[in-house]
């Protein structure tokens, strides 16, 4: 595996290339954007979810990924999430002046998802509430429902954030996944926003 290290700037941007025998991934983000996205992962439903993530988090993001999707989408999907987590962590820098916490409850027709984010520096995921069998559904021809948890696991681990994600209602597998991505996006947007009332790092420890 080779990685070109994520490079942060004062503008809260970062870029990273990550290459393994299974995938090649480029991710570039701007936390202070307007939700502009340029996404190509070779997994159309995942492209749709990442585009929604950008739109509702207001993070500008470019993703270019190729991988062994002829075998399974898992490697490419997870490697993109790993790389996104890494650039998110780098773009946040020392986290000075951010709100740190964010929460959102988002519906999509019959589906409803609740997300809470803490940019704590301590990776942790609590993920629940999906209806029985959701993990076995094939969505859009390539994306299995089980990948949703893998995506959030990879992001939280590599970004160093805590995420509680709970599906409160839902029947359609597509809607259940999309509501989660949108809830995460809105919670993340709130958590990484600059708060003019915050001086320094929002932690009694003085570091996150």
Curated annotation (Swiss-Prot):
Keywords: Amino-acid biosynthesis, Cytoplasm, Histidine biosynthesis, Lyase. Its EC number is 4.2.1.19. It catalyses: D-erythro-1-(imidazol-4-yl)glycerol 3-phosphate = 3-(imidazol-4-yl)-2-oxopropyl phosphate + H2O. PROSITE patterns: IGP_DEHYDRATASE_1, IGP_DEHYDRATASE_2. The keyword Cytoplasm applies. Coiled coil: none annotated. GO terms for molecular function: imidazoleglycerol-phosphate dehydratase activity. InterPro entries: IGPD_sf, ImidazoleglycerolP_deHydtase, ImidazoleglycerP_deHydtase_CS, Ribosomal_Su5_D2-typ_SF. It is an enzyme of class 4 (lyase). Pathway: Amino-acid biosynthesis; L-histidine biosynthesis; L-histidine from 5-phospho-alpha-D-ribose 1-diphosphate: step 6/9. It is found in: Cytoplasm. CDD domains: IGPD. The keyword Kinase does not apply. This is Imidazoleglycerol-phosphate dehydratase. It comes from Paenarthrobacter aurescens (strain TC1). The gene is hisB.
